[in-house]
Design a protein with these regions (language model features):
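Short amphipathic alpha-helices in soluble, non-transmembrane regions
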Residues: 167-188
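Acidic, proline/glycine-rich low-complexity IDRs
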Residues: 183-218
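Long, contiguous N-terminal structural blocks used for assembly/anchoring
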Residues: 2-173
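Intrinsically disordered, low-complexity regions enriched in Ser/Pro/Gly/Gln/His and often acidic
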Residues: 42, 55, 174, 199, ...
Length: 218
């Protein structure tokens, strides 16, 4: 067999289609939209911020046991250090605790106020600088709620030069509640929106029976 015959007998090479080669795209595929519900914004910080700053341990010496719910211990914490109850009342907070809280609380939380009461910052500042003559009462709201916070709703003032005022239950013309409040407000630079809803002379056990004025905002 000749070389010509042998070459002719071989099958022809297949013709490949002319497919252009394209570089891989640099744009990633779209990310599917999340079906999870968006996080609900909190009042003063992410959930658990009160636990992280140690709020509940600071409040423990001042728990208002009579205001606890029936059958509840004054303070029960879960494994994360948060209170089991979402409402933790306290009374008689002293100057050292107030000063500690001023250094720990975030700025936004210090702006909290009980309706028209003074801001938390001015209340804590008054207490911290009064060497026991000003005490605070209020409550903490736990991480279970979106309004997790510390609130002060009342202060107790024992300055000796303020004890001569006369406050009457019926707030008649002779009642000196407005004059008393103005002295307290100006002395301690309190930024309240109105006079306290209640002003009562008391001798609380957490102040050792010392006489003082209890001023409360609804």
């Amino acid at each position: 067999m000749s070389a010509q015959t042998s070459l002719a007998a071989q099958p022809a090479s297949p013709v490949l289609p002319n497919i252009p080669v394209r570089p891989p795209t640099a744009t990633p595929p779209p990310v599917p939209a999340s079906t999870a519900a968006p996080a609900v914004p909190r009042l003063y910080g992410p959930p658990g911020w009160t636990v992280r700053i140690g709020l509940w341990r600071l409040l423990e010496p001042w728990l208002d046991t009579p205001r606890c719910l029936p059958g509840e211990a004054p303070l029960r914490l879960d494994a994360l250090g948060a209170p089991v109850s979402d409402y933790v009342p306290f009374r008689g907070m002293d100057a050292a605790t107030a000063a500690d809280l001023l250094s720990r609380l975030p700025a936004a939380a210090l702006s909290d106020r009980q309706n028209l009461a003074p801001s938390l910052k001015t209340m804590l500042t008054a207490c911290a600088g009064a060497d026991g003559q000003v005490r605070l009462c209020g409550y903490g709201i736990g991480p279970q709620r979106e309004d997790e916070r510390l609130s002060v709703e009342a202060l107790w003032v024992a300055d000796a030069d303020l004890q001569g005022y006369e406050v009457l239950v019926e707030h008649s013309r002779d009642c000196q509640c407005s004059a008393l409040w103005e002295r307290v407000r100006d002395r301690y630079e309190l930024d309240a929106g109105c006079i306290p809803d209640d002003i009562v002379r008391t001798r609380p056990e957490w102040a050792g029976g010392t006489v003082g004025w209890w001023m409360w905002w609804d």
